[in-house]
Amino acid sequence: MSPDREAVGVLIVDDQAPFRRAAKMVMAATPGFEVIGEAETGERAVELFEELAPGLVLMDINLGPGINGIEATRRITAAHPDATVLLLSTYQAADLPSGADTCGAAGYVNKEEFGPAVVLDLWKKRHDGASSSS
C-alpha cells in the first residue's frame, strides 16, 4: 500500500470468535485494509458502525441472540447508503435466507471462499467504477 493512501477500516461481525480471528488474518494479508473493530451481535455492529465509520463491514448472516446480519446490514445501509457490507456465511448462494438480496449488501461470499483476492475483487468492483472520474 502506498504511504499516501490510508488503509480502509474494516469491521468484522461474527458471533464465532474463531471466525473473527480467521477474518482478521485474511484482512492482515489483504493490502490496503486494516481491522478497526469487531462485534459479536447485529446490534453491536450497528453501534460500532456509527462509532468507527468503517469503509468495509464483513457481516455474518447468522448471529446469536438479537438481530441477524441481514437486519443489521439493512439498518446500516438505510442510514448510510454508501456503506460497503459484505455478507458472509456457510450457505450456498442459492440457499441464502430471505432478504439477503435486498438488504443493501454489496455482495455475498461463502466463508470457505473468503480470502484476500475475493475482498480486493469486491472492493474494486464496488469502488473503482464509482471513483474513476478525476
Language model segments and positions:
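Active-site residues of response regulator receiver
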Residues: 14, 60-61, 89
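Short amphipathic alpha-helix used as the core "switch/output" element in two-component signaling
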Residues: 47, 67-81
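The short loop immediately C-terminal to the conserved phospho-acceptor aspartate in CheY-like receiver
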Residues: 55, 62-64
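As written
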Residues: 100-107
